[in-house]
Amino acid sequence: MKTNVAVFFGGRSVEHEVAVISAVQAMNFMDTEKYNIIPVYITKNGEMYHNENMKNIDEFRNIPALLEKSQNVTMVKQGDKFNIVELKKGLFKKVISSVDIAFPVVHGTNCEDGSVVGWFELLGIPYASCDVLSAAVGMDKAVCKYVLQKAGVPVLDCVQFYAKEYVAKKEGILKEIEDKFGYPVIVKPANLGSSVGISKADDKDELISSVKDAMNYASKIIVEPAVTELRELNCSVVGDTDDCETSVIEEPVMTGKILSYDDKYKGGEKSAKGSKGVKGGETAVGSKSSGMASLSRKIPADITDKIKKDVETYAEKTFKALGCNGVVRIDFLYDTAKDKVYVNEINTIPGSLSFYLWEPKGVKYKTLLDRIIELGFKRARTKENLKFSFDTNILENSMSFGQKGSKGSKI
């Protein structure tokens, strides 16, 4: 019997389109002899729709037309089953399909930050990705730094502040940044990915402009010193806290001061034929090099054995410190002047699920997807042995609690 895998993708995020690309790509590589694949598209306003044709990226060229011919759905628990049901008026809901495991392919705020998997946890359905805590910590760049520092993983120092705080204490915050780091600095929204809202500031005017831009995307901002002699390195990790392994290491190719959104997701347009030392990619979704995989990159990165070992060690430490599950990608800053690496951020649901970092190790995308799903089921089996309630019911005596009103009673 095949396993029913519901792939949830899209979402209320500035990285919505990237998630669509990643998800369609993944669905086209899943083993159809093992899985029934159920696409569930989450719109930018949070509605969910199902259509079997959502496995074809061309359908998303006209989303209103796609939704018009799709079913508005949600997922519910009915008895001991999890079902995708059509949302219609009336007592009885049409069951589209039962679901054995949920597979989220979402990126960014309101999605990758634990919001979607929190819903899965509430329902109690097995799911194939990081849990709520690791996803939430991984999304908040400031909190993630604090956790990793405690775990002995090198990260850059930062100044963090909130938008309202900045408006009230602007000059004081700017002075703190200048006194602590000088220039240049990097300004980032604290909880976005894909390089959205990130910019480099070489002086005070640019810092003010960068903060203003970042506040368009998040209310919490971080500023950190810029590494001037910089190379960026990425490494994927797959597994769980019991056992995990690292992929090959890549070096993305930057076209500007920092690795931009266009570098990550439009790089294939300029490198479709590839070039010496840089892996280019086709841009057609469903091909091996679309989405994050279209980024111009060097695989493997041309680095020393020492740096390679450092990246692999800190990637595993980061994975375990956050309690990750499934596949993640950890991005590093390599300060060539100091010959030192720092963890920049973790992507708990990475673009293209980082399959392109596993293929050089002989792991096919189909095999990687199998493992991610197996890890989701493994975690669910482990949870079945844990207690989540007691066999007592204090509400049996609730009448006595309610006599004096809930505010005056003590339980």
Write out the residue ranges for each language-model feature.
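Phosphate-binding site of ATP-dependent enzymes
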Residues: D202-S287, D302-K306, V341
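Hydrophobic beta-strand scaffold residues
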Residues: I37, P126-Y127, V155, V185, ...
